[in-house]
Amino acid sequence: MKKQRMLVLFTALLFVFTGCSHSPETKESPKEKAQTQKVSSASASEKKDLPNIRILATGGTIAGADQSKTSTTEYKAGVVGVESLIEAVPEMKDIANVSGEQIVNVGSTNIDNKILLKLAKRINHLLASDDVDGIVVTHGTDTLEETAYFLNLTVKSDKPVVIVGSMRPSTAISADGPSNLYNAVKVAGAPEAKGKGTLVVLNDRIASARYVTKTNTTTTDTFKSEEMGFVGTIADDIYFNNEITRKHTKDTDFSVSNLDELPQVDIIYGYQNDGSYLFDAAVKAGAKGIVFAGSGNGSLSDAAEKGADSAVKKGVTVVRSTRTGNGVVTPNQDYAEKDLLASNSLNPQKARMLLMLALTKTNDPQKIQAYFNEY
């Protein structure tokens, strides 16, 4: 009898400690279960005195891998998921409450307009919440500057948005991805980074999306701001040196909230013996805008100018940029009279981003030129 009472008591205690006294468990779908686990994990480790940073992963070399640790070029980009990227840098938990989500996992040459819109909309949604203090986007370096500038024009918040990548895959000896990611999270959580537009962090440097560009095919110091200089540096602490003067983020005229697609804008590269047929082909393919990467100060050959003039008369906006990599493309009276616009100091790939967004607002050449002068 005594043994039976002890058994009943033991069973009751077990019932309480295992939570069986609660109502029956509701069965979750695998998707719901995964979401619940993710939220629970984040809540359990969250520190109230640290900034909440969301990492949005898109792929690229930073998510690349290869069987050889010595390979820095023969790897596959976009194969490592966001959770693995976060787990590889546990030190981030000391500077921020970090959570992540996978937007896509591709090499950045495969980032298209649909992905750009998806990313910008997701960032705006997240930053509208008081629970998110900053965003880090992991991205391939090949087109990183294009995405960065697009976000610089379309994010509607002064909270920090930082784009980060790497030049070596995650499996390489001395991979630069973990350090870059740590620094990006640090910058995204810094109060001083607010109001500076979209920033790019690699190789201990902080750059403005407006001016930064990739300058080398393989080296880790590939991103430069050339004549304009870096916004800041990271040496344990963050040091901001320059202010951003061009309009950006919440001060721009552009919004992606109601956009499902962007106008087709193509880039034509100028060279000796180029011809009007290049413009004809772009117009025939459906281009609403064309950026011409001209020689020198956005110069066109006679043949190219004929093609550009023809495109404008068919309702296509043409913007002159330069293939030189530096300098301002200045207005030219002869070109201006034909509505061949000047990109100011935007390189061709960034001029394309601005022109796509400008064309969602207007087709007026003077208004579009004003955008290039402002942004």
UniProtKB/Swiss-Prot annotation:
Domain of life: Bacteria
GO BP term (any one): asparagine catabolic process
EC number of the protein: 3.5.1.1
Record: residues binding substrate: S108, T141, D142
PROSITE patterns the record matches: ASN_GLN_ASE_1, ASN_GLN_ASE_2, ASN_GLN_ASE_3
Statement: the UniProt record of this protein carries the keyword Signal: yes
Catalytic activity: L-asparagine + H2O = L-aspartate + NH4(+)
UniProt xrefs under InterPro entries: AsnASE_II (IPR004550), Asp/glu_Ase-like_sf (IPR036152), Asparaginase/glutaminase-like (IPR006034), Asparaginase/glutaminase_AS1 (IPR020827), Asparaginase/glutaminase_AS2 (IPR027475), Asparaginase_C (IPR040919), L-asparaginase_C (IPR027473), L-asparaginase_N (IPR027474)
UniProt-listed SMART domains: Asparaginase (SM00870)
Induction remarks: Expression is induced during limiting-nitrogen conditions by the nitrogen regulatory factor TnrA.
Region of interest (Disordered), residue spans: 22-46
Transmembrane in keyword set: no
Classification via CDD domains: L-asparaginase_II (cd08964)
Further details from the record: B.subtilis contains two L-asparaginase isoenzymes: L-asparaginase I, a low-affinity enzyme located in the cytoplasm, and L-asparaginase II, a high-affinity secreted enzyme.
Name of the protein in its database record: L-asparaginase 2
